[in-house]
Amino acid sequence: FYAAYLAKTGIVHPMQNEILASQFQDPYMVARQLLAPTNRPIFYQKHMTQHMVDGVPRAWMAHVTNVFLIRHPARVVASYAKKREGPQLDDIGYRQQAELFDHVTSLGQTPIVVDSHDIRDDPAGMMRKLCDAVGLKWDAGMLHWPSGGHASDGVWASHWYGAVHRSTGFAD
């Protein structure tokens, strides 16, 4: 929903033109794409809650397993401010995250919530719990990865994902 968010709000972001050119700007087209068959048994999607502004469809959320990754606000603000000057409350996404959590709950689902602090403290234990919660087989290989980008990274990765691209595991 990144391009749809930028198109709707008019907020200026780094790499904006590349983002707008790379994705649907119509949030209904994005939602339709999220539910399209992928010919894979597992289809991981990462969404930034701040991109889920008013008018972004929510019905698709009833058809997926929703996991909310939370992080201490001070860490979020500090990280975001390194990449974009003068962040506002809605840039961080906490209000939207609460609304999305309430929406998922209203669907009769019990959303899974994972605190990033807990993952950093006990990566293996938390990843096992998360796998159990979403019905995936645990594999210790999930704890480490090669440094660098991933084929599924968006065009914005070079700006936003520097720390992730340098990491090789949760403790990095």
Model-derived regions: residue spans:
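Short, conserved loop/helix-junction motifs that constitute active-site signature segments
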Residues: 57-63
